[in-house]
Amino acid sequence: MPEPDSAREDCDAQCASCSGERVIRAAQLLSAPFRAPLILGARALAPVRADVRRSVRRSLGVPPEPPQRAERAGDPFLPPGGMARRVHGDLPSMVVGGLAALLLQTLHPLAMAGVADHSNYREDPIGRLRRTANFVGATTFGTVEQATQAIESVREVHQHVRGRAPDGRRYAASDPELLTWVHVAEVSSFLAAAERYGPSRIRPDERDRYFQETAVVARSLGARWVPETMDEVEAYFKRIRPELHDGPQAIEARKFLLRGVARSPSDRVVYVGIVAAALAIVPRWARDEMGIPAPPLMDNIMVVPFARAFCGALRWTLRP
């Protein structure tokens, strides 16, 4: 759920004036691997790759270097060798999965009302991504203390996010059912992106382990009845689908997400590719509700190969 203005002042003051430029710069940097001269040796490319790696992470709203991972027994919030770290540790697929999650989340009228009433995503389009990335980093790779602090901060913010949706129903970010929706939409998209565009195959039992590990975070935020297996996730979506539908607020937010803020033709091409990759992993029933065609042949022949190549190039660039 979004954060109210009072809770975002320190963060937003640092980036509100240049958010559009940062997103454009990110698009330029993301396409850099395709433009790098292949004739250069690995040693000659190393300094360039290190600079691009730091710049890409800053432009995406995450720290210039990956977070320090808590490894000592009893210290990490989530298991060091677990599936959450494996999925969340692959930034290229997480970028695609994050966009897919935002698109999917627009279909819940109460969640969307909270975004429309309390978020400044139009003025600071990268702000929510940055805050989400910091939260995911702290809860996935941080210590118990770091994760607990991040969770308590979010819970405090949620206490102030409440209101009434256009249909007259009241909403609150602390509502356990809304928290479950946001969580399931998010982690299912992260996993779908990892399976489609990630560096390695994920087994069925590993899917369940991923949902079990991330459910700990959701319950810590106040969510209830959190799915812990792929079967439970699919059953959850089947149960909640009657509550999901499109509306003016959802359409406005989705248009913003699909359009982006890229200016130059090359930047737009890159962003269109990311959008196409994200839409390819949005469930078909959700795309039908959004009125966005889901041609599997085009996805399989054009979108998926491009996205895999793109993620592979970015993964090479970001490798320490």
Predicted segments with their positions:
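Mature, function-bearing regions of proteins
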Residues: P2-W181, A185-P320
